[in-house]
Amino acid sequence: MTEIIQELDLNGEMLVRREKLAALRAKGNAFPNTFRRNALAQDLHTQYDEIESESLKTQGIEVKVAGRIMTRRVMGKATFITLQDMSGKIQLYVARDNLAEGVYTDDVGNWDLGDIVGVKGTLFKTKTNELTIRATEVHLLTKALRPLPNKFHGLSDQETRYRQRYLDLIANEDSRRTFIIRSKVIAGIREYFISKGFMEVETPMLQIIPGGASARPFITHHNALDVDMYLRIAPELYLKRLVVGGFERVFELNRNFRNEGVSIRHNPEFTMLEYYQAYADYHDLMDNTEELLRKLALDILGTTIVPYGDLKFDFGKPFERITMHEAILKYGAEQGIVKEDLYDFDRAVAVAQKLGIEVQKSWGLGSLVNAIFEEVAEHHLIQPTFLMAHPAEISPLARRNDENPDVTDRFELFIGGREIGNGFSELNDAEDQNERFDAQVAAKEAGDDEAMFKDEDFVTALEHGLPPTAGEGLGIDRLAMLFANANSIRDVILFPAMKTKS
């Protein structure tokens, strides 16, 4: 019953607003586009909040602002309005006697919450010392036909916030702050790599062979070529082709797509940084990553201590570096896991089954060890930690370790028990790469939907010679979650994947 009443109220209010718009149309141009502002709300606060009232009065500072009406208090012949623009809010004082004859009654009197207006006026301070603009000229720029959510008492319904992000951005200052932080993360990353001599590039989104990661791809069809194609799951193989071609430092900030589950940590469409550096190894990349994250924290938050929920991550001190085996033995001791369990297939199967892990037929020892790590150790990696020495079986593109060829020169960055990044010294042995691709094909034929496709052209590229190279991918969405203190990945993606409303 309440919903019906609310719908009737909404329809009634929209009818009134449409009538006001019709009256504007009858007068002429209902959507003018000639007003030009010369100031933003936050800039005015920054520049004039500390100026004394008398000084403002003497200076007679004239400004032009534009934005959305968020609140309105009518006090007879004057109205106080809160105006919101992209930078923040500022108060307007709109009085009948300061405007041309008839404007206050005929124009301002018909303004509604949500309308977009342009205002010219002078700065002053109210009795409560609030910086305010005394309007001398006003313009209705856009008539809002729908009222703000809940008369702007807030927008708390989570699903509505995701489906109608524009309302969320209007109503919730925290959401606007989150996406400003996300933008700063991306800008900071781009600035860092350009300053280090990297070249930004773009590689195909539509691919004949989806490669560069183990994941289930989205499939589409190219009508003109009459061929199935895939949305990319990673740009890795194309970026390494560029290193073969002589671009020795490259990076890309772009979207990847993986046809997998949706959760607070996963969205099928997500943003990644991938970069490749010739004549470097995975140790160099770990150093780069520490430096980058420390810089981002300082630039965005002004400190290397990053608050996240009840936790605080310290980006100021060296990140811990630990191998996968070391992590399992450290955090799996209570389950009775010993070193020998990680080097024998049957013993590893027994440990996995004891932990309740569903062992897949296609798994070898490396996959078992990885599954055991995810079960007993991953969630313990709270402070920034580089996990190293992953099994070669689960790292088909990474260079084998010189001392132990069963593992690779690879790392994953964990913060708060979540993987944030993945990097390794690149496999540049074309014959070894070909064999590993064949192993991935066998795994796919055995039922592993996430095993990699074989890319013959990439093997050909390696045969021309890839210099010693290291590469890394960092999840932008998860970094944004960290710096914005957001609990869900949907909170940092402007338009997250949502099931269609029935």
Swiss-Prot record:
Cofactor, free-text remark:
Binds 3 Mg(2+) ions per subunit.
Residues recorded as binding Mg(2+) 1, renumbered to this chain, are: E412, E419
ATP-binding among keywords: yes
Instruction: Please name the top-level EC class of this enzyme.
Output: ligase
Q: Which residues form a coiled coil?
A: none
Q: What is its EC number?
A: 6.1.1.6
Major localization class: cytoplasm
Q: Which GO terms describe its molecular function?
A: ATP binding; lysine-tRNA ligase activity; magnesium ion binding; tRNA binding
**Where's it found, cell-wise?**
Cytoplasm
* Quaternary structure annotation from Swiss-Prot or TrEMBL: Homodimer.
Q: Protein name, please? A: Lysine--tRNA ligase
Native source organism of the sequence = Histophilus somni (strain 2336)
Q: Which gene encodes it?
A: lysS
